Regions:
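Cell-envelope and extracellular/periplasmic
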Residues: 1-119
Length: 119
């Protein structure tokens, strides 16, 4: 049997916010990752749900968070198959990872984004 992948979720970027060189390379790396994933899965139009990384305000190590966030916004703006999902209002356990209630909220937002793409 085979299956069809409805969408991909990408929720990463905080680690890249901790070093300027990584943050500056993030946009290009993200574009390459999305292109390679689509090529591997055989679908140029694979929808990707991109969760906006944290702003780093609660974590001084994430000094370059805004560079990563801007890269994410640019990738989503340039690719009609990428939907940016905001998580700024969710609660973090350790300055990076969401607590259980916020994981559920994010899951609902992601499901809603997939369903909205169908319509």
């Amino acid at each position: 049997e085979s299956c069809e992948i409805e969408a991909m979720v990408w929720c990463q970027g905080e680690a890249d916010s901790t070093r300027l060189e990584w943050a500056e390379a993030y946009k290009t790396n993200l574009q390459h990752l999305f292109a390679a994933t689509r090529a591997d899965l055989g679908g140029e139009k694979l929808p990707i749900l991109l969760v906006l990384s944290g702003d780093g305000k609660a974590n001084p190590a994430m000094a370059d968070a805004e560079i990563v966030r801007q890269a994410q916004r640019k990738v989503a703006s340039a690719d009609s198959q990428v939907t940016l999902v905001n998580a700024d209002d969710l609660t973090l356990l350790d300055h990076v990872h969401y607590d259980a209630a916020s994981q559920l909220k994010l899951g609902h937002r992601l499901a809603e984004a997939v369903l909205n793409r169908r319509n």
